[in-house]
From Swiss-Prot:
Transmembrane segments: none annotated. Keywords: Antibiotic, Antimicrobial, Bacteriocin, Thioether bond. Thermostable. The gene is tfxA. This is Trifolitoxin.
Length: 42
């Protein structure tokens, strides 16, 4: 059970990083309100 939780946390961390990276890239090319808000939440 603990192993599963740890794996879930790792996956979540990875997806947050990916989302944040995408949001940063998006805001660099053009200001996207949705992307910026998502980036702040992450």
């Amino acid at each position: 059970m603990d192993n599963k939780v740890a794996k879930n946390v790792e996956v979540k961390k990875g997806s947050i990083k990916a989302t944040f990276k995408a949001a940063v890239l998006k805001s660099k090319t053009k200001v996207d309100i949705g992307g910026s808000r998502q980036g702040c939440v992450a």
